[in-house]
Curated annotation (Swiss-Prot):
It comes from Yersinia enterocolitica serotype O:8 / biotype 1B (strain NCTC 13174 / 8081). One of its GO terms (biological process) is Gram-negative-bacterium-type cell outer membrane assembly. The gene is lptD. Its main location: membrane. It comes from the Bacteria. GO terms for cellular component: cell outer membrane; transporter complex. The keyword Ion transport does not apply. This is LPS-assembly protein LptD. Coiled coil: none annotated. HAMAP family: LPS_assembly_LptD (MF_01411). Belongs to the LptD family.
Amino acid sequence: MKKRFPTLLATLIWTALYSQHTLADLAEQCMLGVPTYDQPLVTGDPNQLPVRINADKTEANYPDNALFTGNVIVQQGNSTLTANQVELTQVQKPGEAIPVRTVTATGDVNYDDPQIKLKGPKGWSNLNTKDTDMDKGKYQMVGRQGRGDADLMKLRGQNRYTILENGTFTSCLPGDNSWSVVGSEVIHDREEQVAEIWNARFKIGKVPVFYSPYMQLPVGDKRRSGFLIPNAKYTSNNGLEFMLPYYWNIAPNFDATITPHYMERRGLQWQNEFRYLLAPGSGTMALDWLPSDRLYHGTDGTEKDPTRWLYYWGHSGVMDKVWRFNVNYTRVSDPDYFTDLTSQYGSTTDGYATQIFSVGYADQNWDATLASKQFQVFTTGGNNNAYRAQPQLDMNYYKNDIGPFDLHIYGQAAKFTSVNPENPEAERFHIEPSINLPLANGWGSLNTEAKLLATHYQQDIPNGFASNYKNQNGQDATVPNLKDSVNRVIPQFKVDGKVVFDRPMDWSEGFTQTLEPRVQYLYVPYRNQDDIYIYDTTLMQSDYSGLFRDRTYSGLDRIASANQVSTGLTSRIYDDELVERFNVSVGQIYYFSRSRTGNSETIDNSDDTGSLVWAGDTFWRINDQLGLKGGAQYDTRLGSLTLGNAVMEYRKDAERMIQLNYRYASPEYIQAAVPNVKSPGYQQGISQIGTTASWPIADRWALVGAYYYDTKANQPASQLVGVQYNTCCWAINLGYERKITGWNNQNETSKYDNKVSFNIELRGLSSDHSLGTAQMLGSGILPYQSAF
């Protein structure tokens, strides 16, 4: 395994050099085979425009008809008809001021306008309405991909509709018949950008592979009901997969996509997505339903319910400028769902699914939010310790300019329940008034704040709590000495000052450098909180910005004492267009006394004082393509470097990118952050080095790769390689992914999942001519994220 990393890196370096000479822009290549209309556009009523005819020979019976032979060219406005012979007929109907003029053309007939080109042996056209017929002809769209042939072609509705009888349609360029759709009748609506096909037969080459009595295909980017581009692929887990999305444009503010997703080894899954736009906001609802998964046996190998599903609802909106509605709800049938099945609404790396509903009201100086919060945890046993806040009410009141002071009052009421009946439950009431004195000018600020944190807990402690706690945390674990009723009152005082200095840089004209020192003093007296259970609290990261937070923990269950000074220094460099090119920040927390919440937390066991916590962040955008960033946090209370990351990325454009990164989390930090979750797979810490890259390797070929190696476990964490070949009307993708999906308790090793995928995509029906690298990189367990 260790030899694969340099081999992949060498390959990427070679392709980076080679592709500079071989890559041509795919969009430009595709448009080379598409006809364009390069004549000046004529405006005005087509019926009022004159008809110009040139021919080698003319015979006329004025005013009824005329016969033109030899190199005939008929022009009216933006329409041109050429043929060997053309007969012009003019009929004056009673009561109509404009006569009906028609032409019948024979012999090498060609018709073109700004939207379409037609070619055939015989044609007819009404010069008044632009209705045109062509026998046994061929057509090609102007300015976009799309062509075909038919026994009879018709143009109707001022060239809006192209109607084909026994016709074909393909987005492939002339000379390439890789795929096509054949129908007894095909209607192409240029305004709605859709093709309707009756008795549709989908062909690959000359071989029919799919039949439908009726089909709609989009031929543009406009919203329109109809079948979207089908997709087929092969994976080692699911076998052959085929997806045929149907888009339903229900109304201007409603639409839906229904996708039957056939998986050879699992069965038929229905993927349904509904989008809406209403006065309270916009949102998306999704339901994925696999009624009988033939492969699912669960993580322990036992039989599980084969019905697998996912429900998602995302909503965000504001109504009447004061009401706010938000929903972020995801629920799946089982904890293995994202491991086995691909979804845009979650992944195995998330670890949990969020289920939050909230409605808020905001006025000029106060706001209130009522929410329901719940989490579906996927780790083994993790869901037994998960808590839900149902309901949770948060309120804020602001009153500024009370003399030189600003007043803020925050309040919360929450009820916590657990899915495990042996866990404590609680009602929590919290009020937090604060008053601050803000002072600021153009180069600095000083903010002095005093607040009072008052919290009441009413806890319901079950009789079996002690034994349940020991079963989960070990028989030698110390059971928290919880109380039914707890009152906690803690004052807080803080002074925060910062200054910004700037100067022109001597060595680079137009560049500006800033120096931004910051000092904060924080005092919070100690209160023992071991009699309060943990409901929504976890240890937060101490990155540079975190050095100046009031709290060490999220939530309200733990408020750490503090008698400390945080100091930091930031320097930034801006170019002549005020784009930030470089910054570096370094800071520390100096503790005058021990910071603690009681005796139960790991981080409370340290008696050290002084400079205990250090953090630094840096960012360097060397140029528009190359950048570096990183950060590190050191906490002597946990005995080591706790968190670290570093990223270097070169991005030339959307298709060419190389990223190197490293991420680290100490086992002590993980234990302190998630003490109730026991998983040997990551309790030893995280130390991963990896690379992610995408690069065109030759004309129309793109390669992506990702490799992450865990230096703690001495094993690969994730491997991904994919290659895609793109043409103007189809693309083919071959990929391999190997990822960790769990932990085997029997032999104490990581469980891996290996997946080989083979994917075919139809192209040319929209304006997307990308090489597909973004989709391939986003499919991995550790999806690519841009560094800058």
